[in-house]
């Protein structure tokens, strides 16, 4: 499978700092420009991958972060091969954030100094069950049965078990410092999921919510606070 990414470099200097911006489901690398621009202005190289089944990458299904975790790992090692001194920050959005957290469960190399997870779910099973309940409140079929059918369809069509897509399990094995970000008015992934991820993580971690922000809207509702939290968090990791 061929995977595509954009690699952007700051115009004035060669940097060992690399930000990997991982987009959300049903999106693509080109829609993460607001994040790439900030990192470029801070002197980072920026890698913007198209996840499998998105943008210019190949793939016949959307993995909602699960198989994407392995692609994130591949991009990390591609960066390290180009620059063994690279200092890598992962910045994931929604299911892209889930992919980054799931990658933490795969034991990230020491070149990765920080993970920024914006609006990740706790587990795909829990998120799917919640959405099924919202969509079928007046239906006679129980949520558990609908979820079982959906699990079987995903297993046969995409080849993975959605029950294994569990960032909340992965963060129990995380070692890379992680910043959890979430809008407190998120109607797609409830902010309570972010709070639970923060509580369960065993790595050094911080947590910030954005008042009135919906799904992935923290960077738009309060960009100054958003980037202040991100930049200060990363700066502390560089000092260690």
Model-derived features: positions:
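The serine-hydrolase catalytic nucleophile loop
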Residues: 25-38
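Short alpha-helix in the alpha/beta-hydrolase fold that links the catalytic acid
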Residues: 35, 167, 176, 190-199
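Conserved alpha/beta-hydrolase
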Residues: 36-58
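Alpha/beta-hydrolase active-site loop
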Residues: 62-83
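Hydrolase active-site cap/lid region
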Residues: 102-161, 169
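Short beta-strand/loop motif that positions the catalytic acidic residue
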Residues: 173-175, 180-182, 186
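Acidic catalytic loop of the alpha/beta-hydrolase fold
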Residues: 184-189, 216-217
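Catalytic histidine-centered segment of alpha/beta-hydrolase-like enzymes
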Residues: 213-227
């Amino acid at each position: 499978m061929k995977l595509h990414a954009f690699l952007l470099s700051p115009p004035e200097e060669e940097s060992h700092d690399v930000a990997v911006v991982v987009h959300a489901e049903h999106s693509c690398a080109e829609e993460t420009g607001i994040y790439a621009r900030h990192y470029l202005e801070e002197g980072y190289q920026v890698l913007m991958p198209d996840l499998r089944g998105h943008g210019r990458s190949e793939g016949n299904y959307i993995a909602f972060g699960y198989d994407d975790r392995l692609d994130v790992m591949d991009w990390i090692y591609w960066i390290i091969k180009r620059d063994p001194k690279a200092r890598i920050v992962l910045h994931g959005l929604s299911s892209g954030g889930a992919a980054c957290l799931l990658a933490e469960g795969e034991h990230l190399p020491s070149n990765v100094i920080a993970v920024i997870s914006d609006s990740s779910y706790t587990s795909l099973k829990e998120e799917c069950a919640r959405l099924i309940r919202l969509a079928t409140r007046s239906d006679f079929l129980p949520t558990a049965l609908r979820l079982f059918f959906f699990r079987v369809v995903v297993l046969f069509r995409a080849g993975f078990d959605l029950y294994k897509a569990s960032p909340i399990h992965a963060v129990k094995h995380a070692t890379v410092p992680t910043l959890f970000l979430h809008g407190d008015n998120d109607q797609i992934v409830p902010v309570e999921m972010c709070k639970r991820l923060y509580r369960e993580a065993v790595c050094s971690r911080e947590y910030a919510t954005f008042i009135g922000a919906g799904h992935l809207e923290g960077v738009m509702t309060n960009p100054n606070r958003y980037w202040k939290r991100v930049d200060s968090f990363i700066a502390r990791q560089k000092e260690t």
